[in-house]
Amino acid sequence: MIDFGFDKIALIGAVALIVIGPERLPKVARTVGHLMGKAQRYVADVKAEVNRSIELEELKKMKTDFEDAARNVEQSVSSEVNRTSSEMNQAWESLSSSDGNGGSSGSAAADSYHAGEPLSEPPPAYTHPRKNWRLKRGAMPQWYKQRHGVRAKAQSGAARVARFRPPRPL
């Protein structure tokens, strides 16, 4: 902000003491201090806002660059796929035209495929093994259950108290 040296501050203080007077000088100095603090906070907020806007502009620029690069990659991939598919279609057309002319350029499996005949039996349909899910649930070893105190039988609190209550003296 404004740079004041010691001599300038002393001169301003002496003039303020003469003009304002010793009774109101502390109150005025406190008010000036508050106003200076507010001004410094305002300047800091403006700086932060400017920095944020600059960073936002940089991020927007990076976003557009990234989108352009992605668009270029997409275009190159799609053109390559189109070129490859056209080459494959041309090769397929040349093969089908040579097969249609009576030439035997394919194997017996290809001929049977074009004729619609299956090459072999279809695989058998999947059947579920129908395992007992309760066995899978109880797969925890006994030693683990005993060590960690896993209850084998559920009991209510009252039944547990009755079970472990010492017998009554006769």
Swiss-Prot record:
Q: Where in the cell is it found?
A: Cell inner membrane
- Which is a Gene Ontology cellular component entry for this protein? TAT protein transport complex
What InterPro entries does UniProt report for this protein, alphabetically? TatA/B/E, TatB
Q: Does Translocase count among this protein's keywords?
A: no
Which ranges are annotated Polar residues under compositional bias? 73-93
Give the membrane topology, semicolon-separated if more than one.
Answer: Single-pass membrane protein
Q: Which domain of life is it from?
A: Bacteria
Identify the stretch(es) annotated as Disordered: 69-170
Q: Does the keyword Transmembrane helix apply?
A: yes
Keywords per UniProt: Cell inner membrane, Cell membrane, Membrane, Protein transport, Translocation, Transmembrane, Transmembrane helix, Transport
Q: Name one GO biological process term.
A: protein transport by the Tat complex
Q: Name one GO molecular function term.
A: protein transmembrane transporter activity
Q: Fetch the Pfam families from UniProt.
A: TatA_B_E
Basic residues composition bias: residue spans: 128-137
Span-the-membrane segments of this chain are 1-21
Q: How does it assemble?
A: The Tat system comprises two distinct complexes: a TatABC complex, containing multiple copies of TatA, TatB and TatC subunits, and a separate TatA complex, containing only TatA subunits. Substrates initially bind to the TatABC complex, which probably triggers association of the separate TatA complex to form the active translocon.
Biological role: Part of the twin-arginine translocation (Tat) system that transports large folded proteins containing a characteristic twin-arginine motif in their signal peptide across membranes. Together with TatC, TatB is part of a receptor directly interacting with Tat signal peptides. TatB may form an oligomeric binding site that transiently accommodates folded Tat precursor proteins before their translocation.
Family under the similarity heading: Belongs to the TatB family.
Q: Which NCBIfam families match?
A: tatB (TIGR01410)
This protein is called Sec-independent protein translocase protein TatB
